Amino acid sequence: FEFVKSINNRNKVLLAGVFLSPVDYSKVLAFTGMEGVALMPDWLMRNEDDVLVNSNIQVFEEACADEGIEYRVHKDTDMMAIASLIEETRFADLLLVSSDLFYENVQREQPNFYLEEVLKKAECPVMLIPEDYKEPEQNFLTYDGSESSVFAIKQFAYILPELAGNETILLSAVGHKDELPEYSMIAELVA
């Protein structure tokens, strides 16, 4: 939230808080009943997801109001939380995700399966924010040669021009720069 406050102090933002079920039930094995209908076991349906989500929404709304941040709330507590989040990214300029806490109730080690899914499938740039936020001094951008990675890099520059003066490091899963698709063009873009 400190990052959003910092950006909002420079340029007013509209913050959409997306509140998901604490578990993505689509990743949980379901029992198959008569006629192939998938049934969730009773023990799985007895949880306090809605109470937890509503509590988090209240904290979010109060924090936004206290800081003068315009906001919207999107509550997606259906059984396919990650799919709902991916759908939200189609209409977002930027997705901010806690690099420490994203679905840590399911798997503590980050990046966990859920975070990896979001990073692969998001339809807007994704920014991982640590819980002990400090103003960034460096930008780490990822590039895999795909059109979407170039688009995300360009969007980052358009959306957060105040970070463009930082040292920028381009990360790629490719072993050597000669193997990097369109190396000279991506180097020029991030220069």
Label each PLM-derived region with a short phrase.
Residues 39-54:
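A short acidic, glycine-rich active-site loop
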Residues 71-76, 104-107, 148:
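Short, flexible loop segments at the rims of nucleotide/cofactor-binding pockets, characterized by
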Residues 15, 20-23, 58-95, 191:
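Structural beta-alpha unit
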Residues 46-47, 102, 173-177:
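Short histidine/acidic/glycine/proline-rich micro-motifs that form metal-
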Residues 1, 83-133:
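Gly/Ser-rich helix-loop-strand patches that form or flank binding pockets
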Residues 1-41, 121-124, 134-191:
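Small/aliphatic-rich secondary-structure junction motif
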Residues 4, 56, 60, 114, ...:
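A general structural detector for well-ordered alpha-helical segments in enzyme core domains, enriched
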Residues 74-75, 129, 142, 171:
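Active-site-adjacent beta-strand anchor residues
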